[in-house]
């Protein structure tokens, strides 16, 4: 599929006008397309070790998107026709608190009964990356598949004309390329991270296993209860990312356009050791105990198993992702990775690729890049640190059908109300705006930590008996409107008002969460939550209209 590497002595046509991307997966190819879109005269080279076309279905995980990543693919990169024609529209997140249960209709279901306004997608990574590779070649990007990077010699950051030198091998021939900018998009191999000693652990200790089945897994077929089946319109629960939950874990079911289904277990490393599930047979034994309905569905499809893999201790940070004077960057999993829950991987690709594109723009314009690199890196790490408390020490809550739906509501409101607003309204790359918002964003980050701590304490205080019920996110008018409003185009005053309103809503939601928990466990300490409100006086005001979900049949 690729172009053909010329003779081994080749240098780039114009190294000073070249960006070289190591890694031609989702992060690398989307960055290449974004650079080509922004700078038609820029030479963009992508080196990918895998041969194209890559296999459908059993290629890579990271198959579900949420709103930032979905917007990046569909609108920023213009991939909406491909998403509509060749991928699946996602029916939101859906949760069943069914550990050990034989019938889904007997437990709490959390999800939307109908599609919300702002779309997201389920991605067959093989289909998508083949299309990205095709588009790269069509648009004049030099995409070299089957190409192994052998050595990297970084440019001298003190010499503005110094270039990076990358030796790579394809079909037995070695070539040395030069580039002004070098980006590592090569995933967990972390070539630059290892070379520069940038690896950084975090406190989130979790593992994951996954596999693909060459068949559709439709949870609606697991029940004959007419009322339960009628809850959703359209009746297509299979298009959701379905989460089957229990203490310390969640199992994903993600449909793929190729006709396969992706299945995974993500779990706290202590509660569910990886050694109990790191082969397909062990995973099946684990399902037999924790998810008997899923076990029965998989047991009859053993002959349709397409692959199996696992990651131990999958979450990590990074000491540095952008270097302005050095003109290098990390994107995707070559930098940081949080957790598969809430599918933040594509979001962070969208954000880092956009920052990298802006850094290249500043450099091409002859402006000093160091300041922008430092600011963008600070923002990027702040977003990572903002989301990390959503996961760290929170996996026990997956087994709590009372607290977890409240946590999901909070997490979404925080994501849509703050993080998405910054991305959709192009504020993340506006250094002036981000400077003015620094204190506000730090304060709401502190509130998020306080709420996460409170939710964990609520879960530890006790468990109520689960009952059959539907918690319908689409029934919350304010929640559906928050989702719809993501695509509004706002001028500066309207954005400021939007953010102020959303912070007030987060304050109110935090206080209502405290009130609901105190109705059961009045001894819970909520002082940290109250002290972190954007408006401390709000705790003395009436709580207003109920923002929390109420069960339906």
Question: What residue spans do the PLM features occupy?
Answer:
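Conserved Rossmann-like nucleotide-cofactor binding loop
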Residues: 27, 31, 52
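C-terminal helical "tail/cap" subdomain of flavin- and related membrane-associated enzymes
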Residues: 359-553
